[in-house]
């Protein structure tokens, strides 16, 4: 038996009867390795996130996905009578307010990350889609909330690629995206999907494609949720559309920048 035990453990010593008397250190190391995995899992499960834009199609799906992933979710909205079920706290976040007010609304929430998925659907592009995003980015930085995930639109940061149909919308998104990239030190990820469609989730996507394509809304939400702790996506812009690669694999396969 001592030979069998010491074939897998190091630093074993034997007494005169051939019994192991010094396996405490290796056993401790094995135990500690397991404990670190558990602590890491707990940190992931209990990460607290704010989603701004929960009334939209992507926002609703994102909240569901984050809750399913075990996140503690704060739904930021001016419509605080909404009910998202267990695991979600609804708090007032007014993107039309000034920056100081936003900081005051954010501070007591004590979140670890912020998602910006808000949009005015063309009704208030400057105040919501552009300046609302910028104020939230600045508020996050002022409070030391480093992780910021932005839902943008296809090639919003590349004006030469824009068509005429959504030019005003793209201008607003360009302003919000470039401010995040150029004027903050946040650990941001900007996700730029192509057209959104009301189709069921497939869990299969293409990340960083060169041509636009359709995106099932639940797929976009699932990618956003998966980005949360994907450090290889920090400080980068990622395009996407539906594809044939499972989301976890697609994230792992992203080329280094």
Where are these regions (language model features)?
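Short, Lys/Arg-enriched N-terminal segments with co-localized hydrophobic residues
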Residues: 27-46
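N-terminal Rossmann NAD(P)H-binding glycine-rich loop of SDR-like oxidoreductase domains
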Residues: 49-69
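Hydrophobic residues within alpha-helices
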Residues: 58-62, 136, 176, 224
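Conserved Rossmann-fold NAD(P)-dependent oxidoreductase catalytic core, especially the SDR/UDP-sugar
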Residues: 72, 79-80, 120-183, 189
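Short, polar loop motifs at secondary-structure junctions
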Residues: 75-82, 195
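NAD(P)H-binding glycine-rich loop region in Rossmannoid oxidoreductase-like domains
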Residues: 81-142, 229
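Active-site-lining helix/loop region of Rossmann-like oxidoreductase modules
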Residues: 198-257
